[in-house]
């Protein structure tokens, strides 16, 4: 397998940036919020008001969503302190992690408004919140031993540490022609390669986090998952539409067929049973809660979680922009930037002809043994 970094999202605030087009990521957090809040409440009895609570958000990216999870953590602790009638609350050390290529400058420009909001809303007696950026892959060590109380990550651990592509290794997926991911037409070795790489990566992730967390520390992870046991039966198939648009460019002579055949998106959507099995086998964490949630894919219907009828071309363009926000850097690296506008124009047309569909997410809460 060829090594590849976990992809970064589009930075900045342009129309196709992650900050502008991360609506599915924005709507899944409120659905995961009850589990995150319950996890914090379970932690509360073991936390002193004189402690400094160390919280890490892994794969934070940049944009409006960056501080959403941290805000829930801070708000819930504040609520618990008020209920316990504590005169003071803990201080917070927040670590925002992503790859070095992430737009950390955008994050840092938002820190002051985040901390000002906390101070204004909760008063001077509420513990200070210190924010630090931590560049690096979460498939390596990021923090000292036994230093973290709480780890959160949303839609990040799906990204694989390596691309499951090889034309020389028998179990690679060099024969996944016509696709950019797992599809019904993909041969069995494609599914096996993705599944095996995810198991290896997630096991490594759990092992490393267990070293960095205090005994009894908590971790809440949200995955883009699947509701079907069989990997080829994906709940969302924007990747299928992206493949169609890409191979249209092959037919037009804009993209070489060999280049298209050698591109695969390095991600994996697990089934809930796979997550349980990996967590139990790695054995650093007790599985506390696991919940499968569904969200709509679309522009405004994602925001309201209701099924509205929209102009299909607007919906198609919005969906294409959302896909571009998370895939453009890797596509540009593989094909160059010249094909991107035409590629995503084609994707928008394919998406415009589709009916709305649901995305499956899996929220997991764990406790460090």
From Swiss-Prot:
GO terms for biological process: methylation. SUPFAM superfamilies: S-adenosyl-L-methionine-dependent methyltransferases. Belongs to the methyltransferase superfamily. Type-7 methyltransferase family. Mg(2+) binds at residues 176, 261, 263-264. Keywords: Magnesium, Metal-binding, Methyltransferase, Transferase. It comes from Theobroma cacao (Cacao). S-adenosyl-L-homocysteine binds at residues 18, 60, 65, 98-99, 137-138. Binds 1 Mg(2+) ion per subunit. Its EC number is 2.1.1.-. The keyword Transferase applies. This is Probable methyltransferase TCM_000331. GO terms for molecular function: metal ion binding; S-adenosylmethionine-dependent methyltransferase activity. InterPro entries: MeTrfase_7 (IPR005299), MeTrfase_capping (IPR042086), SAM-dependent_MTases_sf (IPR029063). It comes from the Eukaryota. Disulfide bonds: none annotated. The keyword Transferase applies. Its cofactor is Mg(2+). The record marks 152, 224, 337 as: Involved in substrate discrimination.
């Amino acid at each position: 397998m060829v090594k590849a970094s976990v992809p970064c999202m589009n930075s900045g605030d342009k129309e196709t940036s992650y900050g502008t087009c991360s609506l599915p990521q924005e709507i899944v957090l409120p659905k995961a919020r009850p589990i995150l809040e319950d996890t914090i409440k379970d932690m509360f009895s073991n936390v002193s008001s004189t402690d400094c609570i160390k919280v890490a958000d892994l794969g934070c990216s940049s944009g409006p969503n960056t501080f959403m999870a941290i805000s829930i953590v801070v708000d819930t602790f504040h609520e618990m302190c008020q209920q316990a009638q504590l005169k003071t609350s803990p201080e917070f050390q927040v670590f925002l992690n992503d790859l070095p290529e992430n737009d950390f400058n955008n994050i840092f420009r938002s820190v002051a408004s985040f901390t000002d909001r906390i101070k204004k809303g909760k008063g001077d007696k509420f513990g200070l919140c210190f924010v630090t950026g931590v560049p690096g892959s979460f498939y390596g060590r990021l923090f000292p031993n036994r230093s973290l109380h709480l780890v959160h990550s949303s839609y990040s651990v799906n990204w694989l540490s390596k691309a499951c592509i090889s034309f020389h290794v028998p179990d690679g997926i060099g024969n996944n022609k016509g696709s950019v991911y797992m599809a019904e037409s993909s041969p069995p070795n494609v599914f096996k390669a993705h599944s095996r790489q995810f198991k290896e990566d997630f096991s490594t992730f759990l092992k490393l986090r267990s070293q960095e967390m205090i005994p009894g520390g908590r971790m809440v992870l949200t995955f883009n998952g699947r509701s079907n046991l069989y990997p080829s039966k994906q709940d969302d198939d924007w990747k299928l539409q992206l493949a169609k648009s890409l191979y249209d460019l092959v037919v037009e002579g804009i993209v070489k067929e060999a280049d298209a055949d050698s591109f695969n998106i390095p991600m994996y959507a697990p089934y809930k049973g796979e997550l349980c099995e990996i967590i139990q086998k790695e054995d650093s964490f007790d599985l506390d809660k696991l919940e499968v949630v569904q969200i709509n894919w679309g522009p405004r219907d994602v925001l309201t979680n209701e099924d509205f009828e929209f102009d299909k071309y607007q919906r198609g363009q919005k969906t294409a922009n959302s896909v571009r926000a998370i895939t453009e850097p890797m596509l540009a690296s593989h094909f160059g930037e010249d094909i991107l506008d035409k590629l995503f124009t084609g994707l928008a047309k394919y998406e415009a002809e589709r009916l709305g569909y649901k995305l499956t997410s899996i929220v997991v809460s764990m406790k460090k043994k």
